[in-house]
């Protein structure tokens, strides 16, 4: 069974080797047919502490690393600085 992969934005990098990633999803309400946005935060393992808040990353599910971490950062794009 393939591992799930999600795309999100790094919200926090204050913990060692961990980033908090906000993943947004959109769906249509079954009755009102209005598009709704929901978001969820995931704690993901970042071995080299290379991602900062605002970076777009892809996370992949993995075996439990700690109490909250079940995702690993696979790849990411650093935020453009002007």
From Swiss-Prot:
SUPFAM superfamilies: Nucleic acid-binding proteins
Protein family (similarity comment): Belongs to the universal ribosomal protein uS17 family.
Stored InterPro entries: NA-bd_OB-fold (IPR012340), Ribosomal_uS17 (IPR000266), Ribosomal_uS17_bact/chlr (IPR019984), Ribosomal_uS17_CS (IPR019979)
NCBIfam families attached to this UniProt entry: PRK05610.1, uS17_bact
CDD domains membership: Ribosomal_uS17
Assembly behavior: Part of the 30S ribosomal subunit.
One of the record's GO molecular function terms: structural constituent of ribosome
Protein name, UniProt field: Small ribosomal subunit protein uS17
HAMAP family: Ribosomal_uS17_B
Example of a GO cellular component annotation carried by this entry: cytosolic small ribosomal subunit
PROSITE patterns for the chain: RIBOSOMAL_S17
Gene: rpsQ
Function recorded in the entry: One of the primary rRNA binding proteins, it binds specifically to the 5'-end of 16S ribosomal RNA.
GO terms classed as biological process: translation
Keywords per UniProt: Ribonucleoprotein, Ribosomal protein, RNA-binding, rRNA-binding
């Amino acid at each position: 069974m393939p591992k799930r992969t999600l795309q999100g934005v790094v919200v926090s990098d204050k913990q060692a080797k961990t980033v908090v990633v906000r993943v947004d999803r959109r769906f249509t309400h079954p009755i009102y047919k209005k598009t709704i946005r929901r978001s969820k935060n995931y704690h993901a393992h970042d071995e080299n502490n290379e991602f900062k808040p605002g970076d777009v990353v892809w996370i992949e599910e993995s075996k439990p690393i700690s109490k909250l971490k079940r995702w690993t950062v696979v790849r990411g794009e650093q935020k453009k600085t002007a």
